Amino acid sequence: MQNMVILGATGSIGASTLSVISANPFAYSVYGLVANASVDKMLALCVAHKPKVAHMVDEAAAKQLRAVLPATLNIQVTTGMNDLLGLVTAAEVDTVMAAIVGAAGLVPTLEAVKAGKRVLLANKEALVMSGELFIEATKRSGAVLLPVDSEHNAIFQCLPQEVQANLGRCDLAASGISHILLTGSGGPFLRSDLATLAAMTPAQACKHPNWSMGPKISVDSATMMNKGLEFIEARWLFNTQAEQLKVVIHPQSVIHSMVQYRDGSVIAQMGNPDMRTPIAHCMAYPQRIHSGVEPLDFFKVGQLSFYEPDFERFPCLALAMDACAQGQEATTVLNAANEIAVEAFLQGQIGFTQIAKVNEACLVTVPKCPMGSIEDILALDAQTRVYARETLASIA
């Protein structure tokens, strides 16, 4: 029986994880649930899954949860960073699902790694912001790191065992690998006239054609910043050089990514677009369990198509690839700027195409200095957010 903590329990990844746990009740136990401020959702999860600990990042939300949670459930409600770090490093915890969206997930995810936990990584920002530190911490602690993002999980499944066992430190060329092909659907605006993009609304941006996701990642998919962040994450997970990574637009989201080998072979991972598949794979690896996902019906798939990315349509993707080439400081700046810009777009403060303008302004302007610690990373993140908000004020 694996005891699990779910960071981001009330989000879409959290819901999918709990669905897989419910399908395999004799193999997994919910030890802790972590959310920001959604009291009603957390209350329902506590009643359904009966964790030992329910942690609310928001202190007022924790107080509200304590007031409404039935005492008979005997669930400890905690708040504050110290309690959160204590939860993810607790001796009773085997596995941590790292699914808090954005930079907020970095510190608890890194602490789980340092504690040697089995970490299921759905928070791509952890590697985008702290790739080298994160990989080094994994190496020192012996933590097991497994990628949950559908694309990185697909790549992982297509790799030989010696690469799977050495994430972040592997040698792709030595294993006969020539390229990693990172697929992306192109989002809801793949076929939209370029002249119409500036007027696109948050509701339109969040209407992904294939995947059901939260608002932030949905907007990132519409700008293809999500693919850019995944490009950076893949660089650290698979120890790649830029020339070993290619982005491929694949609108049907049936092939989740591919690995191309020196001999001309290409291995692809396919399946219906449902996050329960990569989640179940990571939870059970190297075994396989029931995920609740319907198997792919090849007779209904129809045509599969592939295109090169259009960087005029997706400037955020180009910015992310450029930042990856510049290094860790640039990717940290880009991530922070994008979080502020997307939040502003969702609140109606800026237009869709202005997201890229905010990101580019921060990349060009925010001074970058060497980062040797988590404190350095968080300081640069905070500095960038200040500048991004100033940039918003000038264009809003």
UniProtKB/Swiss-Prot annotation:
Protein family (similarity comment): Belongs to the DXR family.
UniProt-recorded name of the protein: 1-deoxy-D-xylulose 5-phosphate reductoisomerase
Q: Which residues bind NADPH?
A: T10, G11, S12, I13, N123, E125, G214
NADP recorded as keyword: yes
Q: Give me the gene this protein comes from.
A: dxr
Where Mn(2+) binds, per the record, is at: D149, E151, E230
Q: What does this protein do?
A: Catalyzes the NADPH-dependent rearrangement and reduction of 1-deoxy-D-xylulose-5-phosphate (DXP) to 2-C-methyl-D-erythritol 4-phosphate (MEP).
Q: What cofactors are annotated for this protein?
A: Mg(2+); Mn(2+)
A Gene Ontology biological process noted in the UniProt record is: isopentenyl diphosphate biosynthetic process, methylerythritol 4-phosphate pathway involved in terpenoid biosynthetic process
Residue positions binding 1-deoxy-D-xylulose 5-phosphate: K124, S150, E151, S185, H208, S221, N226, K227, E230
Q: What is the lineage of its organism?
A: Bacteria, Pseudomonadati, Pseudomonadota, Gammaproteobacteria, Alteromonadales
